[in-house]
Amino acid sequence: MTLTTEDFNYDLPHELIAQTPIKERDESRLLVLDHETGAMEDKHFYDIIDQLNPGDAVVMNNSRVMPARIYGIKDKTGGHFEVLLLHNIEGDRWETLVKPAKRAKTGTKIIFGDGALTATVTKELEHGGREIVFDYDGIFMEVLEKLGEMPLPPYIKEKLDDPERYQTVYSKEPGSAAAPTAGLHWTKELLEKVEQKGIKLVYLTLHVGLGTFRPVDEDNIEDHKMHSEFYQLSEESAAALNEVKKQGGRIVATGTTSIRTLETIGSKFNGEIKADSGWTDIFIKPGYEWKVVDAFITNFHLPKSTLVMLVAAFTGRENILNAYQHAIEEKYRFFSFGDAMFIK
């Protein structure tokens, strides 16, 4: 049966889109879903510890969101530009989204702030993408911290008082254009409790890129082309995960970015987990054969998105749509600053 984008649609009341983070990260709600039976339980995120067993591994993406949105003016004419950094190609060369794209022709020079940072458009890409080369004095990330702002998703209309609330407590590798949001619920204290229970904490890196902002345009989901994102799994993390597998523990992924990294590696090495880095455009959808992940934490995703499709690949389409309907009836909060699910 060919699945269409419409098969992953659902009606979400606008007021359930969370506009601000909840006061305490781990007091968000948690919908526990059994992927085989479809059985559900309403909990809070701090109850996650009861869902984890000694010998399991919790995998987290330690990518950090860059203050990736910067505003500049065109050299000579003074026209305004908004530039969103997507990923670092090499050195000072970046793939970006520039608005208005039509004014950013190859050779255009853009000035940011008082001129401490300038950029030249070197290549025009599809979807308003532009390759640009930056010029500055000092350390790029420090210059960016001064001039850039957090690129919150378009459905969040309120200003974020504390930018750290759009970072996970363990974020350390700058490079994402959006947060790996399932991880926003973890607190340092809760992670310590998890570790004390005999559960391994394992980190990987996937820099969240352009695809997060790109809807599925095709009716037939098979026609959708996924974006590429950079990932990295260290020798140490691979060894820890293999040890857990060997002892019969579960690999519990925090978020779709951790899932995509682990399943990319599992697909590449015939189900084995090895240290690896590279670019992934894996599209996990119903019919996918899972290689590594046994259970996962995830937020509630946008209708018709590739992320709903990924979750449906694990739970079955009917189970996940039923769970979303339950969450709507129970007034769970949706999307980046919303509540979480634990799917086992």
UniProtKB/Swiss-Prot annotation:
Pathway per the UniProt entry: tRNA modification; tRNA-queuosine biosynthesis
Catalytic reaction list: 7-aminomethyl-7-carbaguanosine(34) in tRNA + S-adenosyl-L-methionine = epoxyqueuosine(34) in tRNA + adenine + L-methionine + 2 H(+)
UniProt keyword list: Cytoplasm, Queuosine biosynthesis, S-adenosyl-L-methionine, Transferase
Molecular-function GO terms, alphabetical: S-adenosylmethionine:tRNA ribosyltransferase-isomerase activity
GO cellular component terms listed in the entry, alphabetical order: cytoplasm
KW Metal-binding (keyword) present: no
GO biological process: queuosine biosynthetic process; tRNA wobble guanine modification
Protein location: Cytoplasm
Root EC class: transferase
EC number: 2.4.99.17
Subunit structure as annotated in this protein's UniProt entry: Monomer.
Family of the protein in this entry: Belongs to the QueA family.
Task of the protein: Transfers and isomerizes the ribose moiety from AdoMet to the 7-aminomethyl group of 7-deazaguanine (preQ1-tRNA) to give epoxyqueuosine (oQ-tRNA).
Protein name per its UniProtKB record: S-adenosylmethionine:tRNA ribosyltransferase-isomerase
Organism the protein comes from: Pediococcus pentosaceus (strain ATCC 25745 / CCUG 21536 / LMG 10740 / 183-1w)
Lineage: Bacteria, Bacillati, Bacillota, Bacilli, Lactobacillales
Gene behind this protein: queA
